């Protein structure tokens, strides 16, 4: 109980906004990742080889795009604007999968949109760390709480994904994911701060929870 009171004093509205956005982006990603292979085999009619190829291309593209955007964001630009851009790409990606069943389109446009969208989470953690540093808050505690939101999202998301996909169809599932990303975009625009860039002495590893559940790094 004492820990909760202490934590409540240390967390302000901006930190709560960070946690809400992290949870919502995590849920939206957890809606898409577990059902991807089922979607490709059932809805698109892809054979096992093409399903595997999709995952391979998606992983390679995700790594390259994430590294490129991370490097650019470290050198210049506003992380908040980049997060908003990634959320917008995530909306486009979810809507593409909701209404398109053409494999070639999905493995090109879909993978590119997903790769751009996947950068949202590591950039969110990087922005949260910069804000915590600038406001003299406990960075480690706050990062741990944010990671807990991701864990909860991945407990809730997969069962919800299969429930929606099997009972209401993949179009409804991806449309709901798109809606969650839209809400996240609005929350980022209204609640999250823009932090003046401060040089950091070391790289900080950050878990990336994308639409497909990849792992990445954000350099802070």
PLM ranges: what are they?
Residues 172-190:
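Symmetry-related core transmembrane helices of the 12-TM Major Facilitator Superfamily/SLC fold
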Residues 64-78, 165:
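Helix-to-loop junctions at the C-terminal end of transmembrane segments
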Residues 1-15, 191-219:
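Juxtamembrane intracellular "pre-TM" segments in multi-pass secondary transporters
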């Amino acid at each position: 109980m004492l820990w909760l009171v202490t934590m409540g004093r240390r967390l302000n509205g901006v930190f709560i906004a960070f946690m809400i956005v992290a949870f919502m982006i995590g849920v939206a990603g957890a809606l898409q990742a577990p059902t991807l292979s089922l979607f490709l085999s059932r809805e698109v009619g892809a054979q096992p080889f093409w399903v595997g190829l999709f995952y391979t291309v998606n992983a390679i593209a995700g790594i390259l795009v994430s590294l490129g955007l991370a490097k650019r964001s470290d050198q210049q630009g506003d992380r908040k604007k980049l997060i908003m851009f990634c959320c917008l790409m995530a909306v486009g990606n979810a809507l593409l999968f909701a209404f398109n069943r053409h494999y070639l389109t999905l493995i090109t446009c879909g993978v590119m949109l997903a790769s751009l969208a996947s950068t949202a989470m590591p950039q969110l953690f990087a922005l949260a760390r910069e804000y915590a540093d600038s406001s003299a808050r406990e960075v480690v505690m706050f990062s741990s709480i944010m990671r807990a939101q991701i864990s909860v999202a991945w407990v809730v998301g997969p069962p919800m994904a299969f429930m929606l996909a099997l009972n209401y169809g993949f179009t409804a599932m991806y449309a709901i994911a798109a809606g969650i990303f839209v809400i996240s975009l609005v929350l980022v625009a209204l609640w999250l701060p823009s932090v003046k860039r401060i040089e950091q002495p070391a790289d900080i590893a950050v878990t990336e929870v994308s639409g497909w559940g990849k792992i990445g790094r954000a350099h802070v």
